[in-house]
Regions:
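Sec-dependent N-terminal signal peptides
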Residues: 4-17
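Sterically constrained small-residue positions within well-ordered secondary structures
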Residues: 11, 68, 82-84, 135-137, ...
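Compositionally biased P/S/T/G-rich terminal and signal peptide-adjacent segments
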Residues: 64-87
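Non-cytosolic coordination micro-motifs
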Residues: 20-62, 90-194
Length: 194
């Protein structure tokens, strides 16, 4: 019953997306690209939540909050390094599926089905890619994209990490629902690991 209610919350929470043509009009738990994190967290909370990354490029700062919501286990945000306003360039909410990727796939398919109804006119596709942090190629991102003409996107991913990556970073398999600005997406695809 909780899963059904959580999916309904997710669906009703994103219905405004159907008429939006700008990624900043989309929200996850009321938060969106272009918002200041200061609208949701204190500066102390932000500074105390900065996390290291496996990215070689340090253009963006990552923070994570594990005070989940009714549906999500936690949130991750990226903003430009030294940005005193902490403007959100990317955000994602996640659910952990420790060593249980099959359940992640089931939840991903449920969310994709519902979101696809809302995004009828936006290019969407599924793609499995190797995770850049794992040079062995054993960690996979099973991604579903909704791409906007601006270059921004919405992603619904199941991240399936290898045992090596789990040991190195303590990353567990998870579902992520995320928003990325076009600028952040360009950085992620072309600069982040160079």
């Amino acid at each position: 019953m909780r899963v059904f209610i959580a999916v309904l919350i997710l669906i009703f929470g994103i219905q405004s997306w159907t008429k939006a043509d700008d990624i900043s009009e989309f929200e996850i738990e009321g938060m969106s690209i272009g918002d200041s994190l200061l609208d949701y967290y204190s500066e102390n909370e932000i500074k105390n939540s900065v996390k290291g990354t496996s990215y070689k490029s340090k253009k963006y700062t990552k923070i994570e909050f594990y005070k989940g919501s009714e549906f999500y286990d936690g949130f991750q945000f990226f903003f430009k390094k030294n940005d005193k306003k902490y403007i959100i360039s990317a955000l994602s909410a996640h659910l952990k599926y420790k060593h249980n990727i099959e359940d992640c796939f089931k939840k991903q398919d449920e969310i994709i089905e519902e979101v696809s109804i809302l995004f009828k006119n936006i290019k969407n596709y599924r793609k499995t890619i190797n995770h850049n942090a794992d040079k062995s190629g054993k960690s996979k991102i099973h991604a579903y994209f909704f791409d906007f003409n601006s270059g921004a996107n919405v992603r619904i991913d199941c991240n399936d990490y290898s045992k090596k990556i789990y040991k190195k970073y303590q990353w567990v398999d998870n579902l992520r629902v995320g928003l990325m600005s076009s600028e952040f997406r360009e950085w992620l695809n072309n600069e982040s690991y160079k």
